[in-house]
């Protein structure tokens, strides 16, 4: 059995949402130790999972790796669609666990696009790899319109910078009780299209100054 543990991530936003600049997006965020996701993975003849939210990722992983099947048990997790990056962490945890169970190299950065991850921000992939405070370089604007690319038709943005946070830093997370969730899927895509269509390129210049000079 293989056990994979990873923490949530906080996404602070994007450096640039304007098509006037050569690179679009450019995620900024930080990996957390808690809340965390813990999954147990082992070989199986079919796809078996005790969590319906994980099953689509597990099926995609089994297909991507070309293995017969896998069994995943979720021992600990954090809420979905609450800004903590659960989708990417679930997908990459399944990928890493199944790959290791079969003696394969996970290669999460390379395979994340085939699991639908890293299409805008590379922060979730980068924090899964090594944690820390992360800034990625974004995607080439020339390859993008206000619509997202077809699934898998991208590479995860390279990391521009990664910094280890001081050990005494703490983040206080306050999440509302109940089933309230943030946007995802088509709803999130619509919001992002609107943001890109109306983005002010001058704001990106100000953000770049803050990130690189202060």
Predicted regions and their residues:
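Predominant activation on well-ordered alpha-helical scaffold segments within soluble catalytic domains
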Residues: 59, 92-96, 112, 212
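ATP-binding N-lobe of GHMP and related small-molecule kinases
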Residues: 1-82, 100-106, 119
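Amphipathic, alpha-helical segments enriched in basic
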Residues: 3, 7, 14-16, 69, ...
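ATP-dependent small-molecule kinase catalytic core of the GHMP/sugar-kinase superfamily
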Residues: 20-23, 110-214
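DPxDG-like acidic metal-binding loop motif
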Residues: 84-109, 125-140
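Electropositive phosphate-/nucleotide-binding environments in soluble metabolic enzymes
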Residues: 6, 36, 51-55, 88, ...
């Amino acid at each position: 059995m293989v056990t994979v543990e990873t923490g949530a991530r906080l996404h602070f936003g994007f450096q640039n949402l304007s098509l006037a600049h050569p690179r679009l997006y450019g995620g900024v965020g930080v990996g957390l130790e808690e809340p965390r996701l813990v999954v147990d993975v082992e070989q199986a003849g079919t796809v078996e999972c005790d969590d319906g939210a994980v099953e689509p990722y597990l099926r995609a992983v089994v297909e991507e790796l070309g293995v017969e099947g896998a069994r995943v048990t979720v021992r600990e997790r954090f809420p979905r669609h609450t800004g903590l990056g659960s989708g990417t962490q679930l997908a990459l945890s399944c990928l890493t666990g199944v790959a290791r169970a079969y003696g394969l190299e996970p290669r999460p950065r390379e395979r994340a696009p085939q699991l639908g991850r890293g299409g805008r921000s590379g922060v979730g992939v980068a924090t899964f790899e090594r944690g820390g405070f992360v800034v990625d370089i974004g995607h080439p604007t020339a390859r993008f319109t206000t619509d997202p690319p077809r699934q898998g038709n991208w590479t995860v943005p390279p990391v521009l910078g990664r910094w280890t946070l001081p050990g005494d830093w703490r983040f206080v997370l306050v999440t509302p009780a109940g089933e309230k969730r943030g946007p995802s899927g088509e709803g999130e895509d619509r919001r992002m299209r609107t943001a890109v269509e109306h983005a002010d390129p001058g704001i990106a210049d100000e953000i770049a100054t803050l990130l690189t000079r202060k």
